[in-house]
């Protein structure tokens, strides 16, 4: 089934020079880049994006990190795009859960700075795409 999903290459992925390799992995997987935007996220967008974590102690740090430097926001399309992207990304904890060969397994060291984000369901994808790309 063809799907769309939001991807973020977080500030650590941009700052550490991993954008080209991440995009290459997306394309090698057979997924299509439908939108791509380099930007510094504003606080309002970051807070909306992470609203399910608003009551957690790490919320402030999460918002600070995601707004601290440029990131890439994108929409990826393809057959089972959500699962395909999550497979490419690897587990959220890059040491305990992400295997070598995944983006996080290869490039991340901490849960807080784990290089990429991807929607975890069709509902999340729809909500997140509307936050980052309200005109699409």
Curated annotation (Swiss-Prot):
SUPFAM superfamilies (alphabetical): Nucleoside diphosphate kinase, NDK
Keyword check for Cytoplasm: yes
Keywords, alphabetical: ATP-binding, Cytoplasm, Kinase, Magnesium, Metal-binding, Nucleotide metabolism, Nucleotide-binding, Phosphoprotein, Transferase
Binding site for ATP: 10, 58, 86, 92, 104, 114
Pfam family, one: NDK
Molecular function per GO: ATP binding; metal ion binding; nucleoside diphosphate kinase activity
Protein's UniProt name: Nucleoside diphosphate kinase
Organism: Corynebacterium glutamicum (strain ATCC 13032 / DSM 20300 / JCM 1318 / BCRC 11384 / CCUG 27702 / LMG 3730 / NBRC 12168 / NCIMB 10025 / NRRL B-2784 / 534)
Phylogenetic lineage: Bacteria, Bacillati, Actinomycetota, Actinomycetes, Mycobacteriales
């Amino acid at each position: 089934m063809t799907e769309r999903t939001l991807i973020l290459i977080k500030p650590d992925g941009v700052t550490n020079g991993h954008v080209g390799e991440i995009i290459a992995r997306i394309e090698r997987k057979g997924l299509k880049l439908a939108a791509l935007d380099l930007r510094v996220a504003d606080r309002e967008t970051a807070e909306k994006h992470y609203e399910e974590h608003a009551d957690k102690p790490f919320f402030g740090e999460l918002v600070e990190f995601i707004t601290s430097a440029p990131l890439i926001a994108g929409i990826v399309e393809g057959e089972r795009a959500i699962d395909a992207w999550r497979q490419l990304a690897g587990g959220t904890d890059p040491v305990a859960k992400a295997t070598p060969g995944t983006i996080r397994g290869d490039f991340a060291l901490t849960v807080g700075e784990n290089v990429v984000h991807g929607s975890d369901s069709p509902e999340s994808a729809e909500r997140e795409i509307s936050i980052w790309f309200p005109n699409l």
